[in-house]
């Protein structure tokens, strides 16, 4: 009995010491304004999180009005230090910032079913090397296969009917982007496998929704809870199904190699081979890396494609100039890298649609602003909120905005969709810029070339409304538009007139 009492007293003492340390230790972020802290009578941050989810834009605006340095914000994940955009250039290449840990923390990469978010298992260095040294240099070679697949998908999704008929823009965009990405990532057979395309589209949505449910539980209970949630079981099933599909691809590749000539072997030029080359014999998980590619590529690109389609329906005066540019450029350059670069108005339209969608050690910035070790940070990137926006009429859509800026010598290099600058960080900034943005830009331009030359587009009675969820701003998933087949001026499958 004495031993039990001793353990009880000892445990209580340790718990008391821990409580004192936690509750009475100085908050290293206390110097920064707290925008949505607990209100009187609120014991936990539950209501603060709800206010963030539903009112993030107004909270950001409030924060900017109170300080021009940094402020604290309760998000649905954690307390975040939000920095003013003036610090972007100072932090763009800071070696002490880690952009792989937040996704793993936010999406529970250590739990089964969430392995594609685990940076140890997916090995982001292999992924980044593949994108940088293999995918991006091959942009000039992906034009024709992407064009062929776009032609195939649009015929299935939009049909060849010359009568007006309705489509769901978001669903169509997801199918198109998933198939195009899979064509380059895994080849022509897998990109038409409904099971794989279903995983590419559905896994990310399911993972995001399940992560929200898990955040309602104490973190120390997640190792147990996730075994019983139906959505977690579904994620584990999808990971296993993905492993089966990729395993078949790898087995087929190995069989082909055994009896292949060098010419036949060279035909397998896609991310399966590229990832193996970049791993250089080191550890990586092919299935998880392919799922990771799907997570980062499918929904973000499909969301931008959807938004561009909505914006063009709301600004139909852009359709004919875009079609004229497409005909001129593709007739002259085919689907070469030069063609992608010279689609300048299309590039400007994409960048404008993207514009309107809007730490391991202590870091002290040049003005004395301190970022304590372990702090999660974000930066304001919504120029309709920032009073120091560098864009004229920044809250209005102007499809010609960036093509006009090309005439300004000091800004000409900043105007392309793939350019990353301090005032347009749709693809990130500095060392943290998205390495796959060149492929994404190519994919979207080719998809839009086919869509605009082959179909008339118009809005119905319902105007699309972007959906907000915390910091997230996504294109309308419900609004439909009307389309009908038109006769394209040139053949687009191979880029020849």
From Swiss-Prot:
The protein's required cofactors: heme
A GO biological-process term: mycotoxin biosynthetic process
Taxonomic classification: Eukaryota, Fungi, Dikarya, Ascomycota, Pezizomycotina
Pfam family, one: p450
Pathway assigned to this chain's UniProt record: Secondary metabolite biosynthesis
Protein's name according to its UniProt entry: Cytochrome P450 monooxygenase PC-05
Gene Ontology MF term list: heme binding; iron ion binding; monooxygenase activity; oxidoreductase activity, acting on paired donors, with incorporation or reduction of molecular oxygen
Keyword terms: Glycoprotein, Heme, Iron, Membrane, Metal-binding, Monooxygenase, Oxidoreductase, Transmembrane, Transmembrane helix
Broad enzyme group: oxidoreductase
């Amino acid at each position: 009995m004495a031993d039990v009492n001793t353990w009880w007293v000892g445990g209580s003492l340790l718990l008391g010491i821990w409580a004192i340390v936690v509750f009475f230790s100085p908050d290293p972020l206390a110097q920064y304004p707290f925008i949505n802290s607990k209100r009187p009578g609120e014991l936990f941050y539950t209501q603060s999180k709800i206010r963030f989810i539903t009112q993030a834009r107004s909270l950001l605006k409030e924060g900017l009005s109170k300080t021009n340095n940094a402020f604290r914000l309760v998000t649905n994940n954690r307390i975040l230090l939000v920095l003013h955009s003036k610090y972007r250039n100072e932090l763009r290449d800071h070696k002490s910032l880690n952009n792989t840990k937040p996704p793993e923390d936010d999406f529970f990469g250590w739990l089964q079913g969430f392995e594609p978010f685990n940076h140890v298992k997916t090995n982001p260095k292999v992924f980044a090397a593949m994108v940088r040294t293999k995918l991006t240099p091959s942009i000039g070679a992906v034009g024709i296969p992407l064009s062929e697949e776009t032609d195939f998908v649009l015929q299935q999704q939009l049909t060849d009917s010359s009568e007006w008929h309705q489509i769901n823009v978001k669903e169509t965009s997801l199918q198109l982007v998933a198939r195009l990405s899979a064509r380059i990532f895994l080849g022509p057979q897998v990109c038409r496998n409904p099971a794989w395309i279903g995983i590419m589209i559905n896994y990310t949505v399911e993972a995001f929704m399940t992560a929200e449910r898990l955040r309602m539980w104490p973190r120390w209970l997640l190792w147990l809870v996730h075994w019983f949630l139906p959505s977690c079981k579904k994620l584990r099933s999808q990971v296993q199904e993905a492993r089966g599909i990729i395993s078949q691809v790898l087995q087929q590749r190995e069989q082909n190699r055994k009896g292949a000539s060098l010419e036949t072997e060279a035909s397998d030029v896609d991310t399966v081979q590229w990832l193996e080359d970049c791993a250089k014999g080191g550890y990586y998980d092919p299935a998880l890396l392919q799922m990771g590619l799907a997570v980062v590529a499918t929904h973000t690109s499909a969301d931008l494609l959807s938004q561009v389609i909505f914006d063009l329906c709301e600004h139909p005066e852009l359709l004919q100039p875009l079609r004229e540019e497409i005909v001129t450029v593709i007739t002259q350059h085919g689907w070469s890298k030069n063609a992608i670069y010279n689609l300048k108005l299309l590039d400007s339209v994409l960048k404008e649609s993207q514009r309107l969608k809007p730490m391991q050690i202590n870091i002290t910035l040049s003005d004395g602003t301190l970022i304590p070790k372990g702090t999660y940070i974000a930066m304001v990137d919504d120029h309709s909120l920032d009073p120091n926006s560098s864009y004229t009429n920044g809250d209005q859509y102007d499809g010609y905005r960036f093509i006009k800026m090309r005439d300004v010598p000091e800004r000409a290099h900043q105007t392309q969709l793939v350019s990353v600058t301090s005032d347009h960080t749709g693809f990130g900034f500095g060392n943290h810029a998205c390495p796959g943005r060149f492929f994404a830009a190519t994919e979207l331009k080719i998809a839009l070339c086919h869509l605009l030359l082959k179909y008339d587009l118009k809005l119905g009675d319902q105007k699309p409304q972007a959906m907000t969820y915390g910091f997230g701003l996504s294109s309308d998933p419900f609004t439909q538009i009307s389309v009908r087949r038109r006769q394209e001026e040139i053949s687009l499958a191979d880029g020849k007139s």
